[in-house]
């Protein structure tokens, strides 16, 4: 808000006394400068809640709001200690945040598990097999086999955490990386 608009909020007696080089004018100038940062933040508020345009620190905060912090690595070794980092990069985390609501809607399904792995790592070719045959050929009930592309090997810890969090709670799983 500029000085003139602030002055219009004052009683008429004070409005008449406003001049550029008197104490009241100086107070209005200070008030104007104090409001500038808040007004700039409000003017770009929409960018802060858009995962694709949010500043990096705010993108991490959005991820935490969307319960995606379980996929962050912390430099201190434990959640909340040190600086958060996402193994597949901030760009991937932004895309995951963008799709978080839709993914949460279908959480616990094969389709969603494949989709979240694809979005989270930026790699395609994930396959989830439900009740796959065991070592003796009989199907294994309540078990998932996640087949990940070979290129996901450097992100194996992230893939494991995602499968562990997003699979149905009553299932067991194993992860295989396809041959290169």
Which role fits each region the language model picked out?
Residues 1-180:
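Intrinsic low-complexity, intrinsically disordered or marginally ordered coil/linker segments
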